[in-house]
Amino acid sequence: MRDIRQVLERWGAWAANNHEDVTWSPIAAGFKGLIPEKVKSRPQCCDDDAMIICGCMARLNRNNSDLHDLLVDYYVLGETFMALARKHGCSDTCIGKRLHKAEGIVEGMLMMLGVRLEMDRYVERELPGGRTSVFYQRKNSLRS
């Protein structure tokens, strides 16, 4: 079973360092390359995994833009629970619950797609008893 928080952390690091993002560029035309690129200290996912997660995020944005924005603020921009609570006018506990809901929705979308991400071997969460999920074991046995 994959740990959705680790998946989103890797996606957030990828999105924060992505040069082809869909937001407005903070660098004026003609000045690209004068400012060093962001530090890549956080582990990132590969482009293929990121595109799959971006598809899930696009669907979440279409259906619930508040939860989408919350995930982007937390995982891409790195805002804290307290900063998000001030921004949304609620408690940090409420932010935690909303984040958990948004993470669950993205995890459900990934399960419905039935895709195997390249980062799965790094983000596997052990089940009680030290086992990995049956889904993961079955996928690995098919590859052998």
UniProtKB/Swiss-Prot annotation:
Sorted UniProt keywords: DNA-binding, Transcription, Transcription antitermination, Transcription regulation
GO biological process, one term: transcription antitermination
Pfam families hit by this protein: Phage_antitermQ (PF06530)
Molecular function GO terms recorded: DNA binding
Function: Positively regulates expression of some phage genes. Bacterial host RNA polymerase modified by antitermination proteins transcribes through termination sites that otherwise prevent expression of the regulated genes.
Protein family: Belongs to the phage antitermination Q type 1 family.
Name used for this protein in its record: Antitermination protein Q
